[in-house]
């Protein structure tokens, strides 16, 4: 699915995403979540696209550039068990099971599903992506009211790809993002170790919705819950300096010490045996042009560091 919108920076996105018309936070970089955190492909009914400025009925967190509304399937009328298994290249595997309950109460139907999937990255097959997903939906058809409830839980661990920063890097090798597959033990190199660039996330999403009809008037109301927790991993070749040690060595690097936070005073790269910071020799520059497009990559500390 491709939709034209606009994005000011990594923390702002103007393409709205809803699930069954329900808001679910944002999908931005740095804490947001895409629709596949809340819906399994096998439970997807349709994707409704609103181009341009979104419909006034959209309850998305960001919808100035259009909305994608991902809708889930409704429970079937008959009891049945749906099972699927998928395999593919690069260690791709997925197992999916859904139980259709049939009628569990007068005019009330439900389904429950679970799935587990994993695959390796396609560049060097070192990075991994693992995901477990659980979901359930129940619908009750009453005389003048339909009540729908949905719950999903998603637990994922994804080793990431790095973006390509320019034509020269693409021409060098269009099928490599320049993250490395082997741990060298050298921080300058290992900041690009693929398995250190990871996203770990648990997502909960639930809603309860009622559709009511009063003559020619239709009223829709819902309550929803959304929660996510996790972290994003990367391997900078430094430790943040939060302790003012004066002329002494950096205490953050002394075994057994615990730095309890504080204001950021700088960054600690390489030190000598006494914990004293080393600085690059004059004129010694980095040959590393990735990650971050070379920005923040630092100097070749291992070959041109000297005591301050």
What is each stretch, according to the model?
Residues 22-51:
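Short acidic/polar hinge/loop motifs at secondary-structure boundaries
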Residues 222-308:
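Surface-exposed, low-complexity loop segments enriched in small/polar and acidic residues
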Residues 1-23:
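Extracytoplasmic beta-strand/coil segments of soluble accessory domains associated
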Residues 128-133, 164-175, 179, 236-246, ...:
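Flexible, surface-exposed loop regions and adjacent strand-edge segments
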């Amino acid at each position: 699915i491709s939709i034209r919108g606009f994005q000011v920076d990594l923390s702002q996105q103007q393409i709205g995403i809803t699930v069954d018309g329900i808001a679910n936070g944002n999908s931005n970089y740095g804490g947001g979540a895409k629709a596949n955190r809340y819906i399994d492909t096998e439970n997807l009914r349709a994707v409704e696209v609103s181009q341009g400025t979104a419909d006034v009925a959209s309850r998305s967190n960001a919808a100035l550039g259009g909305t994608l509304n991902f809708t889930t399937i409704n429970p079937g009328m008959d009891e049945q068990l749906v099972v699927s298994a998928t395999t593919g290249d690069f260690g791709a595997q997925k197992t999916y099971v859904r139980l259709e309950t049939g009628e569990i109460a007068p005019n009330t139907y439900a389904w429950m599903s679970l799935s587990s999937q994993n695959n390796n990255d396609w560049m060097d097959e070192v990075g991994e992506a693992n995901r477990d997903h659980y979901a359930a939906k129940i619908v009750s058809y009453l005389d003048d009211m339909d009540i729908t409830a949905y719950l999903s839980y998603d637990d994922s661990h994804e080793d990431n790809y790095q973006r390509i920063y320019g034509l020269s890097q693409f021409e060098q090798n269009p099928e490599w993002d320049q993250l490395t597959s082997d741990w060298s033990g050298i921080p300058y190199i290992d900041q690009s170790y693929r398995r250190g660039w990871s996203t770990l996330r648990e997502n909960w999403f639930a809603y309860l919705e009622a559709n009511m009809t009063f003559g020619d008037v239709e009223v829709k109301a819902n309550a929803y819950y959304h929660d996510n927790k996790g972290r994003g991993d990367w391997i900078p070749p430094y430790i943040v300096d939060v302790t003012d040690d004066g002329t002494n060595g950096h205490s953050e690097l002394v075994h057994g010490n615990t730095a309890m936070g504080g204001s950021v005073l700088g960054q600690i790269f390489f030190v000598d045996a006494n914990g004293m910071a080393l600085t690059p020799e004059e004129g010694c520059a980095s040959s590393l042009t990735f990650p971050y497009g070379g920005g923040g990559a630092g100097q070749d500390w291992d070959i041109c560091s000297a005591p301050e």
